[in-house]
Each structure stands twice: as structure tokens, then as C-alpha cells.
A protein has these predicted regions:
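NUDIX/MutT-family hydrolases
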Residues: 154-198
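N-terminal leader/linker segments that precede catalytic domains of diphosphate-processing enzymes
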Residues: 1-90, 95-113, 117-140, 145-149, ...
Length: 224
């Protein structure tokens, strides 16, 4: 029998579990969940020194597509000419603008602008805790279910490509890879958890948000 995330013997209804965990949640305090727990005191001190004192509010849409074979995560590959996170795997999103009523409105707007995802296909479920990024943003992840049948229209100035990853793959700890990367100035390195998928590598804040969802739906459930 596989572990709970693999779930071949006893398939998990991830949709129902996500609804149970996130329904009616609101944006909340920041976490730095893309780091591997158990960071040394030296690494923790260096890590904290990299963050801005007043990060810019931003939001991303975490789109979970309801495919017949199970939920998938819709991800983007950012355009290579962007100033921040160029070429990286990410969720559609960006800074919260003055005209946005809240993080949800910002995430929906950005998803439409970046990849043409029509709001009519989207049902927002709730929020993961904010993630503070070294690039200077405090990001609110807005988790949603997306009905199939949508057509995407990519803004080539921001998005190079889109693809989907099965949520069961993301939730399988066999696919989580701990790696060390250098951040900021000097020689200090920090441990992060990547999620390689085919010829793509999901890492940094995007992997961190997915791992936050994994811990909420898999690890916390197992502890109960």
C-alpha cells in the first residue's frame, strides 16, 4: 500500500479535504514555509536578514483544475525578460493594485491579465498564509478550483508557457527534493525543498506554497 499522498489503495478525495481545510479562511499572517524546517541558528539569522522590513502586498491564484483523472495544479513559466523571478515556475499573480478590493480580486485580475483565465470558470475556496519573498513581496495565495473548458490567452510579455501537474504528484513526498542554494551576498546557503516535474523544476516560493498546502492536507491530517 502506498502512503496517503500516493493513495492507490485508498484514493483520497483531495477536493473534499481542501474544502474542509480552507473553506471560509481569510488572508492571514506571513509564513516562510518554503524553507525546510529545522534551519540552523546561523542559517536562520542570515535568512531573516534578506527580507525587506516593509514588503509589497501581492497575491497569486493557486488554480486547481478539476480534471476527470483528479485535481491538477495550473502553473506558469514566467517570461525570461521579467525583472523579478524571470523564467521561473510560478502561479499567476502580482502586486495588489489600488483598484483591487482585496487579495482575491487582485489574484483573479492577474490571472485574467497574464493567462486569460476567465473568472467564470473559477471558484475561490480560501487562502493559505502569506509568504514573504526575498524579492520584496508579501504574497497571499488564493486557492481555487477551476472547471475544465477554459481557454488560455497568454500575455507573452509576462508568461512564456503554462502546464499542469497532478496534485497527487505534488502531495507525494517521494517527489520532494531538499537542496541548498545561495541567497544574498556572501557564501551562506539555505535549504529549500524543490518539486522536480519532468524537465521543469518547481522551487522557491511556488514550491513553498504547494508544500504549505501539502502539510495542511496531508501531514496535519495524518497527525489527527
Amino acid at each position: 500500500m502506498q502512503d496517503e499522498a500516493g493513495g492507490d489503495a485508498n484514493p483520497i478525495d483531495w477536493r473534499a479535504r481542501i474544502v474542509a481545510k480552507l473553506s471560509n479562511t481569510q488572508p492571514r499572517h506571513a509564513v516562510d514555509d518554503w524553507l525546510v524546517p529545522g534551519l540552523s541558528a546561523q542559517d536562520s539569522k542570515h535568512y531573516r536578514s534578506l527580507f525587506p522590513s516593509a514588503p509589497i502586498p501581492a497575491a497569486v491564484l493557486v488554480p486547481l483544475v478539476e480534471r476527470p483523472a483528479g485535481l491538477t495544479v495550473l502553473l506558469t513559466q514566467r517570461a525570461t525578460q521579467l525583472r523579478n523571478h524571470a523564467g521561473q515556475i510560478s502561479f499567476p499573480g502580482g502586486r495588489i493594485e489600488p483598484g483591487d478590493a482585496d487579495p482575491k480580486a487582485a489574484a483573479l485580475r492577474e490571472a485574467h491579465e497574464e493567462i486569460g483565465l476567465d473568472e467564470r470558470f473559477i471558484a475561490v475556496i480560501g487562502y493559505l498564509p502569506d509568504h514573504v519573498l526575498i524579492s520584496g513581496f508579501r504574497v497571499t495565495p488564493v486557492v481555487s478550483f477551476v472547471q475544465p473548458g477554459f481557454e488560455l490567452l497568454l500575455d507573452a510579455t509576462e508568461v512564456q508557457d503554462t502546464f499542469e501537474v497532478p496534485l497527487a504528484f505534488v502531495f507525494d513526498p517521494v517527489n520532494h527534493r531538499v537542496r541548498r542554494r545561495r541567497f544574498g551576498f556572501g557564501e551562506a546557503e539555505l535549504e529549500l525543498c524543490d518539486i522536480p516535474y519532468g524537465n521543469r523544476n518547481i522551487w522557491g516560493a511556488t514550491a513553498g506554497m504547494l508544500l504549505t498546502l501539502y502539510r495542511l492536507c496531508v501531514l496535519q491530517e495524518s497527525d489527527q
